[in-house]
Amino acid sequence: MEQNVGYVVQIIGPVVDVRFESGNLPAINNAIEIHFDGKTLVAEVAQHLGNDTVRCVALGSTDGLRRGVKAIDTGGPIKVPVGRGTLGRIFNVLGQPIDNKGEVQATDYWPIHRSAPSFEEQVPAVEIFETGIKVIDLLAPYAKGGKIGLFGGAGVGKTVLIMELIRNIATEHGGFSIFTGVGERTREGNDLWLEMNESGVIEKTVLVFGQMNEPPGARMRVALTGLTMAEYFRDVEGQDVLLFIDNIFRFIQAGSEVSALLGRIPSAVGYQPTLANEVGALQERITSTKRGSITSVQAIYVPADDLTDPAPATTFAHLDATTVLSRQIAELGIYPAVDPLDSTSRILDPRIVGEEHYYVARTVQQILQRYKELQDIIAILGMDELSEEDKLIVYRARKIQRFLSQPFFVAEAFTGRPGRYVKLKDTIRGFKEIIEGKMDHIPEQYFYMVGTIDEVYENYEKDMKGK
């Protein structure tokens, strides 16, 4: 087959214009390979400008690139390795391994631009996805094949929560996880990789990184690379896959940079006019089909804490559940620091989770909400000024608050406490006993950092016998 060869005619930062022979223009989203100075630069066709010229976005550095250099049309989009051979490896946006462990034994190579599953193939996300983490399973349950937004500032435990989820799906469900670092700090990616190696989770995980120092084209496409690898496990192997994207805001930010470089007129707050379309193209591919499911957990940075900013606001429309991590809760020493009143889930509905789960979850939230309202009175006047009924609510709320904490497997080395995976039925039973007053005689410290309610009983009875 004869190669379709063009020549570089203009370079503006990461944007490269290439002229091809008349009638031989490569299609939009095709990968173009540019060979110069012993390097290969891959760019992606973004626009047809007329005069047989295409405008491409480079996925690597254009340093040293000159006009007149040959550019070869590969005839299709970027293709990345998929299959079991990708597990335990680290890739860049082009699907090239960056962990110095040699070639990848790929089952196949798939293009990163693919259509979302058709309407007939999709299955609505109404089945609960058990994470083994009490606060999530009870108050903001994840849907199998759903999309979850993880909101939180620096140092409240986003990465630890992500690692625990990866560990739980690997050991309890035997499933695979794909972690995609989009515009991430390289140091954080390195920490994650080292911690995964230590905890043994790496064998069931694929890591894909497009860091902060990469050109915007790479940061914009790296999420699609990770998603394509996840789609293989869903569509061919019929697996339930977990896809982590950290951070979805950086994906939008990279799209905004590329949009400006391509000369598009910016929209609200300077974002790209194609914002909703770009986010939709990614999110619509993350779904359950008749074969398997992709459940995605997406860390979301909120610029200036403004939830009405177009980036988080557009992402919200796609989410099924939100897990909000709170600094106030972390300061109390309660981990995971999930805010039980701010976190929400679309499937916390009696028709999906059942009457008992719904009743227990809502009662727990009512008690915590009432405790929050009473805190000002307690701070000023003390506990003695409360009515007996309110005192009881405060005592139960403090037990609930502590019982929402849980020792994590991935944090064993730091806490010295063995991790706990709590089944959903045990979670519901435990909180039901607290709200029904069956645990009123047990002091609150026994509820801190335990798994099931049976552990609370055991520890209390052991101490009583000791006395």
Curated annotation (Swiss-Prot):
GO cellular component terms given for this protein: plasma membrane; proton-transporting ATP synthase complex
EC number per UniProt: 7.1.2.2
Highest taxon of source: Bacteria
Catalytic activities: ATP + H2O + 4 H(+)(in) = ADP + phosphate + 5 H(+)(out)
Compartment(s) where it occurs, according to its Swiss-Prot or TrEMBL record: Cell membrane
Membrane topology: Peripheral membrane protein
UniProt keywords, alphabetically: ATP synthesis, ATP-binding, Cell membrane, CF(1), Hydrogen ion transport, Ion transport, Membrane, Nucleotide-binding, Translocase, Transport
Principal cellular location given in the protein's record: membrane
GO molecular function: ATP binding; ATP hydrolysis activity; proton-transporting ATP synthase activity, rotational mechanism
UniProt-listed Pfam families: ATP-synt_ab, ATP-synt_ab_N, ATP-synt_VA_C
SUPFAM superfamilies listed in its UniProt record: C-terminal domain of alpha and beta subunits of F1 ATP synthase, N-terminal domain of alpha and beta subunits of F1 ATP synthase, P-loop containing nucleoside triphosphate hydrolases
Binding positions (ATP): 152-159
Function per UniProt: Produces ATP from ADP in the presence of a proton gradient across the membrane. The catalytic sites are hosted primarily by the beta subunits.
Self-association state and partner proteins as the record states: F-type ATPases have 2 components, CF(1) - the catalytic core - and CF(0) - the membrane proton channel. CF(1) has five subunits: alpha(3), beta(3), gamma(1), delta(1), epsilon(1). CF(0) has three main subunits: a(1), b(2) and c(9-12). The alpha and beta chains form an alternating ring which encloses part of the gamma chain. CF(1) is attached to CF(0) by a central stalk formed by the gamma and epsilon chains, while a peripheral stalk is formed by the delta and b chains.
Family: Belongs to the ATPase alpha/beta chains family.
NCBIfam families according to UniProt: atpD
Protein name: ATP synthase subunit beta
Natural source organism: Caldicellulosiruptor saccharolyticus (strain ATCC 43494 / DSM 8903 / Tp8T 6331)
Lineage, top ranks: Bacteria, Bacillati, Bacillota, Bacillota incertae sedis, Caldicellulosiruptorales
Gene (UniProt): atpD
